[in-house]
Each structure stands twice: as C-alpha cells, then as structure tokens.
C-alpha cells in the first residue's frame, strides 16, 4: 500500500495543473484541538494581526469552539511530525454564493515558505468551485504580508485608516478547477498517511 501511495505522490507532483504543490488538508471537527493548539502558539503580535485585536487564550478558545466545520471550510498544513504549522479559515456569509471571508495564520517556524499564499490559492479554488463571487479579507494595514498576497492575486484593496478590506472577484468554476481540488485533497490525504506511518515506524506516535 505504501508503494502505491508513493507512486501516486510522484505522479501527482508532476501534474501540470498543480505545480510546486504543498499538501493542504481540509480539516474537520475532529481537528478542533489541533486548531486550538496552533492558534495558542501565536505570539501577541501575530494574534493581533490574525484577529485584528490582541486576542487572549480565552478569546481564541471561544473562536475555535464556534468554528462551523460543516458550513465553513478550514484548511491546514502539517509538518512531518503532524504538527499544524499553518491554517486558514474560509467563512461563508449568510448567502454562501455571494462572498466568503478568508483568514490565515502561519507559525513563525514556517514563515518564508509561501504557505500563506498557498492557503489563499487553495481557499480561492474551493470558493470558486462553490460559485462564490467574491473572496474578502479584512486586515490591519500593518499586515503587509496578507495584503501583499491579496494584491498579487488581483484583489482590490480599500483602506480605512488603520484597517483595510481586500476583495477578490472569482471567475466561474471550470472542469480543471474541480479536478485540481479533488487531486489536491487526494495528495494531501496520501501525504498525511505517509507522515503518520513514518511517525509510527520511528516510535514518535
């Protein structure tokens, strides 16, 4: 089984639709403790940028408890020790096809790898495949990294003093985006399985 999964990963990483793939998993309610642990590791400065205010542990806990994994979509990147090093939350509005709001966090140890941009692209593809018209980002103006990701993706940014809103218009879904979404999920699941097997073999879990 391992050899077949490894063969799939080699073929997948060479797929023309998905260059330089980062394995991004769709997270479920069972991953809630991992999401909480990830967010609690953020420094005060990172919490301020992620939430727009200096969220304490209790506020972060309430945020995680209220995450609706059925309505919204939560994505995560795991390192080889299955630690959640980056995650994104794509929250859908009252009218799901109208808009969706994106938020992301990356641990300091995983910065500079382009994970924020990868998560943004993944969320955009999922939103597009659900016929969402606009993906929105609410950020502080000092969150230059997040705003740069949005601008590079073609978003329109409106500034309001110390805050900013970015709006990315999404095209209609297409056959290749739906295929890419399925392939990415299969790749991420296979990658996670191999990491889990590696940990078991090395007595880490």
Regions found by a protein language model. Name each.
Residues 1-22, 138-205:
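Terminal substrate-recognition subdomain of acyl/acetyltransferases
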Residues 106, 112-127, 134-136, 148-152:
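Conserved acetyl-CoA-binding loop-helix of GNAT-fold acetyltransferases
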Residues 28, 43-44, 68:
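Residues that cap or delimit alpha-helices
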Residues 22-34:
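A short beta-loop-alpha structural element at the N-terminal edge
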Residues 37-52:
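Helix-loop element at the rim of GNAT/NAT acetyltransferase active sites that forms part
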Residues 78, 103-112, 140:
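A short, internal acetyl-CoA/4′-phosphopantetheine-binding micro-motif in the GNAT/acyltransferase core
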Residues 83-85, 130, 149:
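Structured alpha-helical
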Residues 52-98, 107:
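Acetyl-CoA-dependent GNAT
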């Amino acid at each position: 089984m391992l050899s077949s999964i490894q063969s799939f990963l080699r073929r997948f990483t060479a797929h023309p639709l998905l260059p330089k793939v980062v394995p991004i998993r769709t997270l479920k309610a069972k991953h809630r403790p991992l999401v909480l642990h990830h967010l609690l590791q953020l420094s005060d400065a990172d919490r301020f940028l992620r939430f727009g205010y200096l969220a304490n542990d209790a506020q972060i806990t309430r945020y995680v408890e209220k995450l609706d994994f059925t309505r919204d979509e939560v994505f995560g990147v795991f390192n080889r020790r299955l630690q959640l090093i980056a995650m994104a939350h794509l929250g859908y509005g009252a009218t799901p096809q109208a808009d969706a709001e994106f938020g992301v966090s990356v641990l300091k140890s995983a910065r500079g790898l382009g994970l924020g941009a990868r998560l943004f692209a993944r969320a955009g593809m999922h939103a597009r495949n659900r016929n969402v018209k606009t993906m929105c980002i609410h950020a502080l103006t000092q969150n230059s990294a997040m705003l740069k990701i949005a601008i590079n993706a073609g978003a329109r940014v409106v500034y309001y003093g110390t805050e900013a809103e970015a709006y990315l218009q999404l095209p209609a879904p297409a056959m290749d985006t739906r295929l890419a979404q399925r392939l990415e999920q299969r790749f991420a699941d296979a990658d996670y399985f191999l990491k889990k097997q590696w940990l078991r073999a090395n007595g880490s879990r």
